[in-house]
Amino acid sequence: MKYSLNFYLILSLMLFVACEEGNVELYNAGDDFIYVTVDELRHDMAPHSMKLLELKKGRHKIVITDREGKTLEEDTFEVNKGGLLNVSKHSYIVWTDLYWASSEENSKLRETKLQEEALEIDGQEYVGEFQELDEEQLFIESEWDYGLGEEFPASLWGLEFAQEKWSIKRKIFRKKELAEAYMKLVKR
C-alpha cells in the first residue's frame, strides 16, 4: 500500500510538472487596449491584463495590433520551457532569494550562494540578487520559479527534511511591484 501511494504521488507530481512546461504569460503592461494574435488565435488585451497561454515547444508567430488595426509588431519567437511575452516592452526584474531551514545559517549561506548587490528603483535602494531583463525583448524565456501571477512564498515547506537545508528560488516582478514584495519578504 505504501509503495502504491508513493507511486501515485510521484506520478501526480510528474504530470503537474509536465503541464507547467510551455506556459507563457501574456501581459499587457501598457495603458492602451491591444490585440495580440499568437498562431492565428487572437487575444483581446485590456490595459494591465494578463492571460496564461499554453504553447507547445517550438516557433510561434505573433502579431500585435492596436484598436484601429494598425500593426504595432509582427515577429516570431521560440518557446522551450515557457516564459513571458513582453508585448508592451515593460521593465521586469528577476529576484533570486535563498530559503533555509535554520536561521543561524542564513548570513553564511547568503554570502556563498547569492551575488547580492544594490539596485535602485525610484530613488530607493534594495539589496539582493536581481537581474534586470531586456525590456526590448519580445519573448523572455523563463529562468524563474514563480511567474507574475504567483506569490513569492515567505517560506518553503520540507527544507528541514531535505539533504540540503536550503534552496534558491527565483521570481519575476514588474519593476514597480518589486519594492512592495521586497518589504514584505525581508521582514521574514
Give each language-model segment a name.
Residues M1-V17:
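Sec-dependent bacterial lipoprotein signal peptides
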Residues C19-K56, T65-R188:
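Short loop/turn and low-complexity linker motifs enriched in small/turn-promoting residues
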